[in-house]
């Protein structure tokens, strides 16, 4: 859903490479907004789009209104890509888009090269010892890469190296 309350038609992305990401403004991964904006600026003319879906399900790290979130991102990271209304990505009220995305690409662990991976693993394992056995979104800034034909080709956890994300985007463009 767009911030103005109108439905987003996914067919408007037909023929484009799309990175779908659940975000938060008060998260340790929030600085990834700078990387996302750099990717968007570099590749948007080549048919690349970012679909930013703020979410408050992980540590309450997106507490502000939709308008405040957009203002924060634009002022602090210069974001120019589309930001949707805040939404759930897990559970009874999750967006149908996320039900589909998770059915296409499940969780395959955190990038062990990232210093935050063991922190996230402990946090999640303490809450649910079997957290890694389902496809649910584990934290903010989980990304799904969709090709021009609408196929989900990759799932990147928030700990993934953004250089790898860029490499996969380039392969699809």
Task: Mark where each language-model region is.
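Conserved helix-turn-beta segment immediately C-terminal to the redox Cys motif
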Residues: 11, 16-18, 25-55, 73-77
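Thiol-based oxidoreductase modules, predominantly thioredoxin-like and allied folds used
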Residues: 22, 46-65, 80-91
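Non-catalytic, surface beta->alpha helical segment in thiol-disulfide oxidoreductase systems
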Residues: 153-173
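Generic recognition of short, well-ordered alpha-helical segments
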Residues: 31-34, 63-64, 95-96, 167
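N-terminal "domain-start" segment that seeds a small globular fold
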Residues: 1-11
